[in-house]
Amino acid sequence: MSDEQYDAALSLLRRLDPKNVSVNLNSLCKIAPELAEDLLSSVDQPLGVKTCKSTKKEYLTCDYNRDGDSFRSPWSGDYEPATDGPTPSAALRKLEVLANDSFDIYRDLYYEGGVSSVYLWDQGEGDNTNSFAGVVLLKKTSPSSSWDSIHVFEVETSRGEGIYRVTSTVILDLGSKSPKLGLSGNLTRQTEREMAVDEPSQHIANLGSIVEDVESKLRNQLQEVYFGKARDIVGQVRSLGGVEDAKQKQRQEEVIKGLQ
């Protein structure tokens, strides 16, 4: 694989309809199999939903809980179908269970529905919770729209301080009854914070605070970028004011230029 091919593939995906990112990504992987692994790990796509066979609870699927054709359930901790895929250490699995219960409450409060999942994996050797990584996934769908949040993070702990590096992506797809009208896109932001850690469970509270803050900012930015641009386009097609208002505004601008 050459860097030129990889960059060209990413450039192509950026120019295609984000609504069809999964289909376009699969097509590129078939055309250039040597790019598949890198593309699948670097391109965010809408999250899948499966039901845990053991608990009957829904969970989200992505590249972070996949091993071949199997996906690990955060509720049971097992792969479905069964496989010898990577799993977190005992201490980290205990933290993962707490994280899923906590973000399930967060999801219910902020999304009033949808599905959430949290997956953790060890960074260093041994059974510890001082250095680990993970991902927080949230998804809400309606008949014509969907919201997918993906928060990938790394945690390092030293002297009672936790360093959190988070890469957050929101994939938004808004539709309407008209098949010709839709709005799709994604936004990615990186965050790094240092927060106090008294015990391992404090990591979950800290991550919850970070995710809450980042999602609020991303929502506002999406509203400003996408809806603001759509409003500008509509304004260019049909102004809200009359012709006389436009002339008055033009005269005011000319007076201001003269004063300058």
Swiss-Prot record:
GO cellular component, one term: incipient cellular bud site
PROSITE patterns for this protein: F_ACTIN_CAPPING_BETA
GO molecular function: actin filament binding
Short name of any one Pfam family annotated for the protein: F_actin_cap_B
Keywords: Actin capping, Actin-binding, Cytoplasm, Cytoskeleton
Protein location: Cytoplasm, Cytoskeleton, Actin patch; Cytoplasm, Cytoskeleton
Gene3D superfamilies (UniProt xref): 1.20.58.570, F-actin capping protein, beta subunit
Gene Ontology biological process terms, A to Z: actin cortical patch organization; barbed-end actin filament capping; cell morphogenesis; filamentous growth; mating projection actin fusion focus assembly; mitotic actomyosin contractile ring assembly; mitotic actomyosin contractile ring contraction
InterPro entries: CapZ_alpha/beta, CapZ_alpha/beta_2, CAPZB, CAPZB_N, F-actin_capping_bsu_CS
Coiled coil start-end: none
Known function: F-actin-capping proteins bind in a Ca(2+)-independent manner to the fast growing ends of actin filaments (barbed end) thereby blocking the exchange of subunits at these ends. Unlike other capping proteins (such as gelsolin and severin), these proteins do not sever actin filaments.
Record's subunit section: Component of the F-actin capping complex, composed of a heterodimer of an alpha and a beta subunit.
Listed name of the protein: F-actin-capping protein subunit beta
